[in-house]
Amino acid sequence: AAATEALDDAPRLSAVYQALLNEDLGADGQPDNSIFLSAGDAIIPGLFFNASETINGERGIADILIQNELGIQAIALGNHEFDLGTEFLAGLIAGNDAGFAGANFPYLSANLDFSTDTNLASLVVPDHQSPQANSIAATTVITVNGEKVGMVGATTPTVDVISSPGDITISPLPFDGAPTSEQLDTLAAV
């Protein structure tokens, strides 16, 4: 969502999602079970990201507003969410006193421990709950047409090398891009 093409892409993505919501693949008159998720990197510094400051008073707000408007139900924390540090990310998730409500969805990551990061620790909510706005969790449970679906987020273990995750504890570590079978097992167990 960081490039200027995001303004063109958001309506197209929304149209595709709305078409999928209107599908009746079972031909039973019931809407199909659709969940709208993002794999992360929904906030990427760039021209569009920076232009948000002129319009919304702070960089990145437009990215969150687009995700909210699209109806995203959960986003995995990608490495780019941390590019400007955890204090900046916390402000985008939680909102601000100037009227920006923040993210209408949770950010997910099961392999990051936020308890040691003063900026994000207060946004962490219990796992296995319905999606909560302005929050971070390892998991969430989304109910669609009475059916509960569990979501688990994971963030690249190299985030500390390629971004700025602050005081977050990352699992598995050390992780050099050539994981051992033990490291892969640790990540899979998350």
Where are these regions (language model features)?
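Acidic, metal/ion-coordinating pockets
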Residues: 1-190
